[in-house]
Amino acid sequence: MSMFCYQCQEAAGCKGCTVRGVCGKTEDLAKKQDLLIYTLKVVSLYNVEARKLNLVNKEIDNYIVDSLFATITNANFDENIFTERIEKGIKYKEELKKQISAAGGNVNLNEKTEAVGVLSTENEDIRSLRELLTYGIKGMAAYLKHARNLSYEDSNIQGFMSKALAATLDDTLGADELVALALECGKYGVDAMALLDKANTETYGNPEITKVNIGTRNNPGILISGHDLKDIEELLKQTEGTGVDVYTHSEMLPANYYPAFKKYSHFVGNYGNAWWKQNEEFESFNGPILMTTNCIVPPKASYIDRMYTTGVTGYPGVKHIENGEPKDFSAIIEHAKKCAPPTEIEKGEIIGGFAHNQVIALADKVVEAVKSGAIKRFYVMAGCDGRAKTRNYYTDFAKALPKDAVILTAGCAKYKYNKLDLGDIGGIPRVLDAGQCNDSYSLVVIALKLKEVFGLNDINELPIAYNIAWYEQKAVIVLLALLHLGVKNIHLGPTLPAFLSPNVAKVLVDNFGIGGITNVEDDIKMFENL
């Protein structure tokens, strides 16, 4: 087999990609990523030993985080970057060995060098649990990277990441120990999302109810995609007064909800939809596009010269803006000045900004609506969007929900229904968008607040159903976080993860009520009877 990857929802045949990734990843790139993941596990093995001796190396901790983020689906397609990261990892391993040895520690660790890659673990269930843990750690890394960009860090979370990665090399750990580690990963996932929430809100203010323009103006523009709020802050500052407008795309939409960004008159609104439509939407935008994180779709020749990457992202032939304090966006700004204004593809407004602080401010109104029966049930429909036509299920599901149901969402899954006219209940919109995928944390805070207000003992007693669309590894850490918090009866779609072996899937079904989706009518009946 030339390659094997099943980390995302688009894994070929719900089994795995073996020739080329559906994402566009080549065999050579897949092998480089496998080798980098193995390198990170070995570095983590020594990092754990070093930490036992109070040898904490922030540079190595950050290297692990950034490298994991680069391997997330659709983040980086540049083989050279992975070669550099592998070489850097080998250097760090030797550094750690010297430090451990000098401190009298053990350097005779089992690096398991016989084989690398997913299939190097023969036992299907152990392999499944190791990958579940690895993908959760990848998702966590993304959130830690964004928090660190705003100078918020947590050494304990980074210590757990090394512990978890090292554990995937330990053949003495059985299924029970790995399940426990996965749930512990969920605990640290909550911590990571809380850290990022704190970083974002203390830096830019709490998101607030906002109507976001989805039309265009007649100035040239820059389209910023991905998740990194530090990047959009620096871009807005540097484009001010230049005659260049700024638009968000896909997961950057929630930047419009933050008070700190509303002062910029050239911050127009949001252009387009979820990541997978970018081939058409980047073409019609006419101006340059800045990818701050995933998701990159292999670009068309017609606009690749207008595309820029930054941070951990990369694509061969695409210009990369290096890190800096601040980053220098002058090249993309000058490029924009030479481009035509965006072609308008839609008009109107969408509403969002319902993160935990805003919803809790409306708590009295929400509680009264629940008590009066005006709101019968909340549906958490957070997660990711994707190319599969089966994802139209989520549009149909939103349309078919009874008028007394409210959707709580975060992540690009929202694009399946955030432009539908679903109305409101007593002034409360029936789609409450908390923000990016990491803002699933807000939905947890809201649920815990409602549990407190209603005096319930168990979060599962709330009238909340979980119908989550997943795509990549950030959705995995959100899932593990929910499981850690004791949330049960979560349904995942459009398919269950290919990396869950039948036995591991059974454990999740039996212990947590995890399920898939069937059809809209039957699923709504099922949720109403939970």
UniProtKB/Swiss-Prot annotation:
Q: Which Gene3D superfamilies match?
A: 1.20.1270.20, 3.40.50.2030
Disulphide bonds annotated for this chain are: none
Q: What class of enzyme is it?
A: oxidoreductase
Per the entry, the cofactor note is: Binds 1 [4Fe-4S] cluster. Binds 1 hybrid [4Fe-2O-2S] cluster.
The cross-references to HAMAP family, in alphabetical order and at most eight, read:
Hydroxylam_reduct
Arranged from A to Z, the UniProt key words for this protein are: 4Fe-4S, Cytoplasm, Iron, Iron-sulfur, Metal-binding, Oxidoreductase
Q: Which residues carry this modification: Cysteine persulfide?
A: C384
Q: Which family does it belong to?
A: Belongs to the HCP family.
Organism, as annotated: Clostridium acetobutylicum (strain ATCC 824 / DSM 792 / JCM 1419 / IAM 19013 / LMG 5710 / NBRC 13948 / NRRL B-527 / VKM B-1787 / 2291 / W)
Protein name per the record: Hydroxylamine reductase 1
Upper classification of the source organism reads: Bacteria, Bacillati, Bacillota, Clostridia, Eubacteriales
GO biological process, alphabetically ordered: response to hydrogen peroxide
- Which amino acid positions bind [4Fe-4S] cluster, per UniProt? C5, C8, C17, C23
Cofactor(s) the protein needs? [4Fe-4S] cluster; hybrid [4Fe-2O-2S] cluster
Q: What does this protein do?
A: Catalyzes the reduction of hydroxylamine to form NH(3) and H(2)O.
One cellular component term (GO) for this entry is: cytoplasm
Q: Where in the cell is it found?
A: Cytoplasm
Which SUPFAM superfamilies does this chain map to?
Prismane protein-like
Any one GO MF term held by the record is: hydroxylamine reductase activity
Query: Its Enzyme Commission number?
Result: 1.7.99.1
Instruction: Fetch the InterPro entries from UniProt.
Output: HCP/CODH (IPR004137), Hydroxylam_reduct (IPR010048), Prismane-like_a/b-sand (IPR016099), Prismane-like_sf (IPR011254), Prismane_a-bundle (IPR016100)
